[in-house]
């Protein structure tokens, strides 16, 4: 089904709340199907990684949908561990929003999650973090 690098959206099975966006190649998709746990292709490290392998934030796959071009998949998941998905400590990687105002360009981000679920330094230590906070 997946023969190239595809975008992968993760959302909570019961609420459809979007958790994160990642990428999968054919091998990551195969591993995800076999284990029923999300695996991704790291574009920066050039390797497959299993979500939660270090953090315990495992994503148990419950349902998979694929778009008409077969270049994007949506996984409905149940969260393991601390019930979070974002490596900076929030439940979702989509913890900020851009407010739309008529006729204006706004480049300010507004936080939608007020508190972190966990302290990322307790889990990841001083590992490099590419996220722009």
Language-model-detected regions and their locations in the chain:
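C-terminal binding/interaction regions
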Residues: 13, 18-19, 24-133
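Single conserved hydrophobic/aromatic residue that forms the stacking wall/gate
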Residues: 1-7, 11-12
């Amino acid at each position: 089904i997946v023969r190239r690098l595809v975008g992968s959206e993760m959302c909570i099975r019961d609420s459809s709340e979007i958790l994160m966006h990642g990428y999968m190649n054919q091998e990551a998709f195969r591993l995800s199907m076999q284990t029923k746990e999300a695996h991704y292709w790291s574009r920066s490290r050039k390797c497959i990684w299993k979500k939660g392998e270090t953090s315990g934030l495992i994503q148990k796959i419950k349902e998979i949908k694929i778009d008409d071009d077969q270049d994007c998949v949506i996984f409905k998941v149940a969260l393991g561990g601390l019930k979070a998905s974002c490596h900076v400590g929030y439940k979702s990687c989509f913890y900020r929003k851009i407010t739309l105002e008529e006729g204006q360009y706004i480049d300010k981000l507004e936080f939608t999650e007020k508190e972190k679920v966990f302290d990322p330094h307790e889990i990841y230590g001083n590992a490099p973090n590419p996220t722009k906070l």
